[in-house]
Curated annotation (Swiss-Prot):
Gene name of the encoded protein: rpmH
Database matches in PROSITE patterns: RIBOSOMAL_L34
A Pfam family: Ribosomal_L34
UniProt xrefs under NCBIfam families: rpmH_bact
InterPro entries xref list: Ribosomal_bL34 (IPR000271), Ribosomal_bL34_CS (IPR020939)
GO biological process: translation
GO CC terms: ribonucleoprotein complex; ribosome
One of the record's GO molecular function terms: structural constituent of ribosome
Protein keywords: Ribonucleoprotein, Ribosomal protein
Family: Belongs to the bacterial ribosomal protein bL34 family.
Organism: Ectopseudomonas mendocina (strain ymp)
Protein name: Large ribosomal subunit protein bL34
Length: 44
C-alpha cells in the first residue's frame, strides 16, 4: 500500500497559497484571522 502523502509544491501552493486565499471571500477571512493572531507566516 502506498503512502497517502505524496508532496508536491505546486499543488500545495495552488490550494493553500496566498493567491488561492485571496481569490475567495473566505480565504481573505483566513488571512485576516491569521494577521490578527500575529502569525509569522500567513500562507505556505
Amino acid at each position: 500500500m502506498k503512502r497517502t502523502f505524496q508532496p508536491s509544491t505546486i499543488k500545495r501552493a495552488r490550494t493553500h497559497g496566498f493567491r488561492a486565499r485571496m481569490a475567495t471571500k473566505n480565504g481573505r477571512a483566513v488571512l485576516s484571522r491569521r494577521r490578527a493572531k500575529g502569525r509569522k507566516r500567513l500562507t505556505v
